[in-house]
């Protein structure tokens, strides 16, 4: 699933990157460095291969029943339909990735991928779209909330949740019953709460015949959207104050105005959890949503961003030198 595809004057180059990540080392142990594969689809100028000219970047957090290989065709479709770059990080324990998959390690990989996009690839935070599918909707919503509340970056351009759950605990309660879920399942990825703390437009996509994660989960999330209007105004004031306090205005700015509080639900008519039209019921609704709700730069007449001048031939070496970053930046380091 790696290689190149040329469409007129654009080349979509798919490569595999070894993403350095810090994960918890266990009880009283220091964090451990691992490497997780990350599928990267870069949109390049056919005449100037070193120049990447996408409108932005999508970080795609895939579902439970697949890996980055299984998500590769969807990633390429998003790159073509949205005129953007796409990163698909692998979860520890999935595919060829080492380690164990749990909330802390998946959140750590998500953090490392966002850091890779923003700091190494130089993607502005307001050109970064977080897209989660099924189980990936939890870490995607959690990352958007962290970027809004505590990250020096600011909120992403948009958050897209495809077949989301309100929380892992509520999902387990439906499947196993209240007592059993209380005894065996802790509260993880509380998307319902995280959406009230997210300062960007949110698109929910759900099949009305989803037999794995029932449609009512998205309906509940959409119903709670009214709570975001007040929260969005508070976050907007907080972001402005942080810009003034920092004094440099770098990254921290709110470009979405009232759209920051938008939560829109797209219903996939007749679609189940795994059977749906990816073009018509995922890629196209995302493209329309980004244009409608002032998500830079999709609403600016399709102008490409400034070229990154990134030589992809040396990407592996640059990533290795870049490293996993400081432990204090990771979500697990800030758990109370």
List where the protein language model places each region.
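An N-terminal hydrophobic leader/cap segment in hydrolases
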Residues: 1-30, 320, 327-336
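Membrane-embedded segments
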Residues: 20, 28-116
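Active-site nucleophile loop of the alpha/beta-hydrolase fold
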Residues: 91, 156, 160-170, 187-191, ...
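Alpha/beta-hydrolase fold nucleophile elbow
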Residues: 122-134
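Glycine-rich nucleophile elbow surrounding the catalytic serine of serine-hydrolase chemistry
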Residues: 132-142, 212
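Short beta-strand/loop motif that positions the catalytic acidic residue
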Residues: 197-199, 203-206, 210
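Acidic catalytic loop of the alpha/beta-hydrolase fold
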Residues: 209-213, 273-275
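C-terminal catalytic histidine-bearing segment of alpha/beta-hydrolase fold enzymes
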Residues: 220, 230-336
């Amino acid at each position: 699933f790696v290689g190149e595809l040329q469409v007129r004057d654009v080349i979509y180059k798919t490569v595999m990157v070894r993403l350095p990540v810090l994960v918890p080392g266990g009880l009283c142990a220091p964090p451990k460095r691992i490497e997780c594969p990350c599928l990267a689809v870069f949109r390049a100028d056919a005449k100037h291969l070193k120049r990447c000219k996408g409108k932005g970047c999508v970080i795609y957090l895939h579902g439970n029943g697949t890996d980055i290989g299984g998500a590769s065709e969807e990633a390429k479709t998003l790159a073509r339909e949205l005129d953007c770059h796409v990163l698909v990080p692998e979860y520890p324990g999935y595919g060829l990735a080492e380690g164990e998959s749990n909330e802390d390690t998946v959140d750590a990989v998500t953090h490392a991928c966002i850091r890779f996009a923003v700091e190494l690839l130089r993607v502005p935070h307001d050109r970064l779209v977080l897209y989660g599918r099924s189980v990936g909707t939890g870490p995607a919503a959690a990352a958007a909330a962290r970027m809004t509340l505590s990250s020096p970056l600011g909120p992403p351009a948009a958050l897209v949740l495809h077949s989301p759950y309100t929380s892992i605990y509520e999902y387990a309660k439906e499947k196993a019953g209240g007592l059993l879920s209380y005894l065996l399942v802790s509260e993880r990825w509380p998307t319902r709460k995280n959406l009230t703390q997210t300062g960007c437009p949110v698109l929910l996509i759900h099949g009305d015949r989803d037999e794995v994660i029932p449609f009512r989960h998205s309906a509940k999330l959409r119903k709670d959207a009214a709570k975001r209007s007040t929260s969005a105004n508070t976050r907007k004031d907080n972001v402005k104050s942080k810009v003034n306090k920092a004094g440099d205005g770098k990254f921290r700015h709110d470009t979405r105005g009232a759209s920051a509080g938008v939560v829109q639900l797209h219903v996939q008519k007749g679609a189940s959890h795994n059977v749906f039209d990816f073009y018509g019921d995922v890629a196209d609704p995302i493209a329309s949503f980004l244009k409608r709700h002032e998500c830079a730069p999709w609403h600016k007449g399709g102008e490409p961003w400034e070229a990154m001048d990134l030589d992809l031939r040396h990407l592996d070496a640059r990533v290795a030198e870049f490293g996993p970053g400081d432990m204090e930046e990771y979500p697990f380091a800030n758990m109370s």
